[in-house]
Amino acid sequence: MSTRTVKVGGIDIANDRPFVLFGGMNVLESRDLALQVAESYVKVTQKLGIPYVFKASFDKANRSSINSYRGPGLDEGLRIFEEIKRTFNVPVITDIHEPHQAQPVAEVADIIQLPAFLSRQTDLVAAMARTGCPVNIKKAQFLAPQEMKHILSKCEEAGNDQLILCERGSSFGYNNLVVDMLGFGIMKQFGYPVFFDVTHSLQMPGGLSSSAGGRREQVVQLARSGMAVGLAGLFLEAHPDPDVAKCDGPCALRLSQLEPFLAQMKALDDMVKQFPNIDTA
């Protein structure tokens, strides 16, 4: 099976390469906290030899409640991202929600992300693709993995083949998500790098009435399962104190657990990618 390589700075992202980490926090809560989180990730990933891209949102436009915290907004968010890039010399990934945000975000971010809920919005997809920036496409909770080929085609038609697919769980009844491990293999057949967003796959959407619940206690088991497939990368959110995080705290890893967690993921990835392929078709 052929696999494309997406290049971000000095990082090669591909299903047959050592895994890349898209890691950070769910939403920018403050400049100081963002710098603290980025510094922790940089120290751990450098120690373990894991290629790293910082991630966070400047606006959470799809919160459950009108009263929920959304973020600092586009302008302040981009200023924080620029400072993180300067300070730590790392690439940045962030998501957008409207077509007019694509170009200004692409001028700062190294990867722009298509949110799962918006992944079929053609105008948004086309605007992101036309920037020429690599695009991380989140698989919607309501889409089958086979359907992701249509979103890839929209990006390709707009002239962009620097594309990444990202699994983040599928709706399973009300207030629940599950991960179909067979979906990774289906999406890998399209030839693009495939990531696993283990954090959001642990969500229980609307599970706390006015916000999403989560199952942080199962993050290690689920991440191990995904990494055993042999993926281009892992998408992870961590927080110094998840219980007071302003968004998706119930899913976030404790920042203090980052090193032992990533050490396990790297060991598993290294082992899996040493195995020869067995064609059972």
From Swiss-Prot:
Reaction(s) catalysed by this chain's protein: D-arabinose 5-phosphate + phosphoenolpyruvate + H2O = 3-deoxy-alpha-D-manno-2-octulosonate-8-phosphate + phosphate
Keywords for the protein's UniProt record, in alphabetical order: Cytoplasm, Lipopolysaccharide biosynthesis, Transferase
UniProt EC number: 2.5.1.55
Pfam families listed in its UniProt record: DAHP_synth_1
Disulphide-bridged cysteine pairs: none
Record keyword Cytoplasm present: yes
Signal sequence bounds: none
Biological or metabolic pathway of the protein: Carbohydrate biosynthesis; 3-deoxy-D-manno-octulosonate biosynthesis; 3-deoxy-D-manno-octulosonate from D-ribulose 5-phosphate: step 2/3; Bacterial outer membrane biogenesis; lipopolysaccharide biosynthesis
UniProt GO molecular function: 3-deoxy-8-phosphooctulonate synthase activity
BP GO annotations: keto-3-deoxy-D-manno-octulosonic acid biosynthetic process
Localization per Swiss-Prot or TrEMBL: Cytoplasm
GO cellular component annotations of the record: cytoplasm
PANTHER family, per database record: PHOSPHO-2-DEHYDRO-3-DEOXYHEPTONATE ALDOLASE (PTHR21057)
Family per similarity comment: Belongs to the KdsA family.
Name of protein: 2-dehydro-3-deoxyphosphooctonate aldolase
Organism: Hahella chejuensis (strain KCTC 2396)
